[in-house]
């Protein structure tokens, strides 16, 4: 599936309180980024964010990080997450832009990720 560029995505992400532009700066210290120390779950390849938006809004006692490498998808995720939280900033969820093939640059074993979700990611790398 090819996603068209969303001209508004970059600006909306930059102005979002739950988007992290440089996730590698938090490697090994993700729990410090959240207000509450809860179990940490991550979703790799969050796409439009419908899964993580629903999950995080219903389980506020778990901290979530949604990862995607496509800016347009993160922009759509941001909008879906805001709608799921009645347009308030989530306290238990962050969006980050990262390549899953280089996820070790963003997460460390000291981050103690309890669960990883991978739903319908693209298994065929482009050449």
Where are these regions (language model features)?
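S-adenosyl-L-methionine
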Residues: 1-42, 50-57, 81-110
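Conserved beta-strand/loop positions that form the S-adenosyl-L-methionine
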Residues: 44, 67
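Conserved glycine-rich SAM-binding loop
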Residues: 47
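Conserved SAM/SAH-binding beta-strand->alpha-helix loop
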Residues: 70
């Amino acid at each position: 599936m090819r996603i068209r560029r969303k001209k508004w995505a970059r600006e909306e992400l930059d102005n979002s309180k739950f988007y992290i532009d440089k996730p590698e700066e938090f490697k090994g210290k993700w729990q410090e980024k959240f207000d509450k120390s809860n179990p940490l779950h991550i979703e790799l390849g969050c796409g439009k964010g419908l899964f993580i938006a629903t999950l995080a809004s219903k389980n506020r006692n778990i901290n979530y990080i949604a990862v995607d490498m496509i800016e347009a998808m993160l922009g759509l995720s941001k909008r879906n997450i805001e709608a799921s939280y009645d347009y308030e900033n989530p306290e238990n969820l962050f969006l980050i832009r990262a390549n899953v093939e280089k996820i070790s640059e963003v997460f460390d074993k000291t981050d103690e990720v309890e669960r990883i979700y991978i739903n319908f990611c693209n298994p065929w790398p482009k050449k």
